[in-house]
């Protein structure tokens, strides 16, 4: 792409952002897409500040973007042919596990001029995923990043942005070495990036709502609220919170406004809001995936709206027992589907909602009703579409409990305590999710010191998971054997411990 063409599209994307920001300024919570107009540089740079000088020869891309799918194919040489004497042997190429594509590094750069009305606000950069590991820079300084590309994160830039100036956002995406995964992962900013603007003192933090339905009519909502209003000095201060339940046509079917007691010592805490009842609720199922929306509004000390968040949900019950298996709304349902990776074939790993929707609709036409997210969390768009189309999901977190399968930059032991809360809080309100899977083929590996075939590691993770969702059961996908069933079978300790037994 020539320089003038690249610059035209780059600044067109920037103008679209500023226009969107201006139109959204009246909202109490602005969520602005930053998906259009990123400079992309293939390869590493010694200094992040060099990127601006390289833009004349770089591409301008829109997100989601997978830079690995565009790499050349690398065929295995004669020494890398499979061992035909072993039916389970793969091609021994150094790249076979990642789709015969060269691993590498890609840099993304974006120019942002903050609007004047954002001053005094809380401003977040929200990344829904950077594959495989990523680092985020603002005006040349590292401000955040991820060691697990299948989950998102946000960075508070309220005090870092320079108003009245062009700010440079840069993102480094690193695929690491080929052994960091056993399939084609894609690379780069393969999911959406947003800018979120809220009130700075009273707001909902990340993934703040936990919505449960009881007896197919009662709706319970637990809300995480952050309050640092200066007038809050002692217990007995109340925060007005309003909840409205909207049906699929946008009509209010239940609502309630209540005051929650706030202690100044607890700036960040969860509140169990009073339950609401939906008369003659329409149930969510594979055949009738009916969705309601919970709208929760916060009011400040002066009675003005401080923040508002909307979350779709479905009214349904799920149960698993040895007698009947899975019951949805009291009816037995067989999981008929497949385990699949997050990529989209020739399109690569970029999470295009339209492509995901097409695949799910084809599944429904074939009579399928289920997807296992092998072996990592899919995009939020995927789950929204499963909710809308009536596809049941076994939501899986990891492949192996090993460093190289967890991302390659840090050990798995350093990941799970922050990954599980992000994963569960992100996905727990989706009616399509019926079972949590903590991972794939997990019995025991040398980096785990417990020597009990994965039981202690599972119990620790299960305990943390149920802190954030006690409405669903947990499982792991166990590997029943190695090469020879007669001599290499694995002890069944983990099968006894898991809430639901699952085998590959």
Features from the language model and the residues they span:
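Bacterial Sec-dependent N-terminal signal peptides
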Residues: 1-28
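Extended carbohydrate-recognition surfaces in non-catalytic/accessory domains of CAZymes
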Residues: 26-126, 181-189
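N-terminal carbohydrate-binding accessory modules
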Residues: 29, 45, 202-212, 295-363, ...
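Accessory beta-strand-rich segments of carbohydrate-active enzymes
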Residues: 41-45, 98-206, 228, 246, ...
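Short glycine/proline/serine/threonine-rich loop/turn segments at secondary-structure transition edges
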Residues: 118-122, 161-166, 232-236, 266-268, ...
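Beta-strand-rich binding/interaction modules
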Residues: 138, 218-261, 269
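Surface beta-strand/loop "capping" patches
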Residues: 200-230
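Substrate-binding/catalytic cleft of secreted carbohydrate-active enzymes
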Residues: 360, 370-504
């Amino acid at each position: 792409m020539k320089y003038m063409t690249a610059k035209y599209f780059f600044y067109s994307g920037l103008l679209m952002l500023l226009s969107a920001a201006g139109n959204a300024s009246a909202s109490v919570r602005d969520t602005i897409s930053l998906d259009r107009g990123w400079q992309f540089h293939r390869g590493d740079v010694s200094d992040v500040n060099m990127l601006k000088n390289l833009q004349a020869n770089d591409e301008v891309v829109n997100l989601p973007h997978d830079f690995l799918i565009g790499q050349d194919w690398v065929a295995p040489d004669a020494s890398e042919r499979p061992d035909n004497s072993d039916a389970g042997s793969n091609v021994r190429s150094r790249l076979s596990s990642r789709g015969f594509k060269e691993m590498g590094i890609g840099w993304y750069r974006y120019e942002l001029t903050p609007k004047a009305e954002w001053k005094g606000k809380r401003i977040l950069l929200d990344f829904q995923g950077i594959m495989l590991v990523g680092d985020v820079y603002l005006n040349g300084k590292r401000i955040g990043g991820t060691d697990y590309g299948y989950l998102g994160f946000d960075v508070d830039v309220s005090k870092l942005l320079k108003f009245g100036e062009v700010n440079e956002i840069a993102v480094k995406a690193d695929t690491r070495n080929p052994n960091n995964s056993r399939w084609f992962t894609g690379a780069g900013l393969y999911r959406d990036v947003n800018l979120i603007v809220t009130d700075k003192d009273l707001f909902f933090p990340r993934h703040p709502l936990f919505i449960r339905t009881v007896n197919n009519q009662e709706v319970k909502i637990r809300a995480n609220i952050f309050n640092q209003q200066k007038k809050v000095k002692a217990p007995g201060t109340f925060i007005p919170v309003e909840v409205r339940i909207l049906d699929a046509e946008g009509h209010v079917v239940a609502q309630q406004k209540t005051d929650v007691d706030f202690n100044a010592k607890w700036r960040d805490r969860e509140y169990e809001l009073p339950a609401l009842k939906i008369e003659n609720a329409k149930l969510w199922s594979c055949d009738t995936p009916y969705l309601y929306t919970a709208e929760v509004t916060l009011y400040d000390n002066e009675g003005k709206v401080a923040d508002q968040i909307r979350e779709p949900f479905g009214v349904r019950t799920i149960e698993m027992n040895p007698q009947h298996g899975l019951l949805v709304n009291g009816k037995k349902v067989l999981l008929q589907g497949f385990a699949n990776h997050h990529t989209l074939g020739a399109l690569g790993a970029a999470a295009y909602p339209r492509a995901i929707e097409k695949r799910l609709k084809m599944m429904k036409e074939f009579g399928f009703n289920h997807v296992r997210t092998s072996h990592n969390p899919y995009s939020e768009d995927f789950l929204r579409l499963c909710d809308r189309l009536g596809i049941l999901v076994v939501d899986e977190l990891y492949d192996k409990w090993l460093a190289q399968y967890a991302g390659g930059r840090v050990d798995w032991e350093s990941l799970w305590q922050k990954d599980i809360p992000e994963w569960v809080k992100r996905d727990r309100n989706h009616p399509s999710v019926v079972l949590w899977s903590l991972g794939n083929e997990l019995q025991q590996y040398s980096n785990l010191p417990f020597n009990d075939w994965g039981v202690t590691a599972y119990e620790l993770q299960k305990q943390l998971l149920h802190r954030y969702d006690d409405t669903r059961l947990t499982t792991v996908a166990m590997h029943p054997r190695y090469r020879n069933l007669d001599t290499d079978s694995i002890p069944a300790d983990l099968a006894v411990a898991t809430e639901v037994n699952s085998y590959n």
